[in-house]
């Protein structure tokens, strides 16, 4: 397994975080540390910065710990899901941070390890848990959800047009034997989708696997809590960067942050009170894709969309100190 994978949009991430991380005593959070690629680049680019890395995947944490070991006491790695960031910062005694990075979705390591069950291109156990120490597996979902629940998962999280058809086939086939490995599911999806639909869009199982992964790991629910919590943790002039890999993630990030970028008063109010002014300034115009050059060098960048924002003010009634947190 390659543990020195190339992280996506590294130069752009560093460029966006640069103004915030050059401040004395700067702290940056890598909320999805994975194999440590972005973290390593940030620590090299900013020799004085302290990095707090989170990941729910203990295997990934061990790899990143080895990769970052030479950087010593500037690194804190925590086994945590990113919506637990407030608890992590409280435990570490960190009142605010200067930058937060999210690199969402499944990691290259998780895809490469057959036993994790994320890849539909190889027969493997239907696990798909990012944290293998807890939670139901993809097999549990397939073998226990009824038709309506499975349809909801496939439709909402996979945007699968043939969700009910696939769900019915799953419920019918599991009566003969429970689902345990990915190859059987791939075959079922292929057989459930009309031939015309199978001829475009890549592997027909792609959407089903995405939906199951999101359901197993509660990815969108966690992200909806995590992004506002991360923004709340920023000091004034702190910056947030999010790399998304499908439209569900990207739309959610935009939706939860957008209200902070506009005044919290009616649009026809002639004067905006100070406590109603926006607390967020967008640093990107919409969602930025990777360049053609980056995609040629790193295939994973083909689906990435980047959004970044800066905190421009504290919430009403709270004054943020860029180096000392809330005061």
Curated annotation (Swiss-Prot):
Documented EC number(s): 2.1.1.199
Record's keyword terms, sorted: Cytoplasm, Methyltransferase, rRNA processing, S-adenosyl-L-methionine, Transferase
Binding site for S-adenosyl-L-methionine: 36-38, 55, 89, 103, 110
Cellular localization per UniProt: Cytoplasm
A Gene Ontology cellular-component term: cytoplasm
A GO BP annotation: rRNA base methylation
Region (Disordered): 286-327
Pfam families per record: Methyltransf_5 (PF01795)
GO molecular function, one term: rRNA (cytosine-N4-)-methyltransferase activity
Stored InterPro entries: RsmH, SAM-dep_MeTrfase_MraW_recog, SAM-dependent_MTases_sf
Family according to the record: Belongs to the methyltransferase superfamily. RsmH family.
Function: Specifically methylates the N4 position of cytidine in position 1402 (C1402) of 16S rRNA.
Record protein name field: Ribosomal RNA small subunit methyltransferase H
């Amino acid at each position: 397994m390659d543990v020195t994978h190339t992280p996506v949009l590294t130069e752009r991430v560093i460029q966006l975080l640069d103004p915030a991380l050059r401040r004395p005593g700067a702290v940056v959070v890598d909320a999805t540390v994975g194999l440590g690629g972005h973290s390593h680049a940030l620590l090299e680019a900013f020799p004085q910065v302290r990095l707090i890395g989170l990941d729910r995947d203990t295997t990934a944490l061990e790899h990143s710990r080895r990769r970052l070991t030479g950087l010593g006491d500037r690194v804190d790695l925590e086994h945590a899901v990113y919506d637990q960031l407030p608890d992590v910062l409280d435990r570490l005694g960190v009142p605010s941070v200067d930058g937060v990075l999210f690199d969402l979705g499944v990691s290259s390591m998780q895809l490469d390890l057959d036993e994790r069950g994320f890849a539909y291109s190889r027969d493997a156990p239907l696990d798909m848990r990012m944290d293998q120490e807890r939670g139901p597996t993809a097999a549990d979902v397939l073998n226990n959800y009824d038709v309506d629940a499975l349809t909801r998962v496939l439709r909402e999280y996979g945007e699968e047009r043939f969700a009910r058809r696939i769900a019915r086939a799953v419920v019918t086939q599991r009566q003969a034997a429970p689902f345990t490995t990915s190859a059987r599911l791939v075959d079922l999806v292929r057989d459930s989708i009309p031939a015309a639909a199978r001829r475009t869009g890549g592997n027909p199982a792609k959407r089903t696997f995405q939906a199951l992964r999101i359901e197993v790991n509660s990815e969108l629910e966690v992200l909806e809590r995590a992004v506002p919590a991360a923004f709340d943790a920023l000091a004034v002039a702190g910056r947030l960067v999010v790399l998304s890999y499908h439209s569900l993630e990207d739309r959610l990030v935009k939706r939860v942050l957008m209200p902070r970028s506009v005044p919290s008063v009616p649009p026809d109010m002639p004067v905006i009170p100070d406590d109603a002014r926006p607390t967020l300034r967008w640093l990107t115009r919409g969602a930025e894709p990777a360049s053609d050059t980056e995609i040629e060098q790193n295939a994973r960048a083909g689906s990435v969309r980047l959004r970044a924002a800066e905190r421009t003010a504290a919430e009403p009634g709270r004054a943020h100190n860029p180096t000392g947190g809330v005061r």
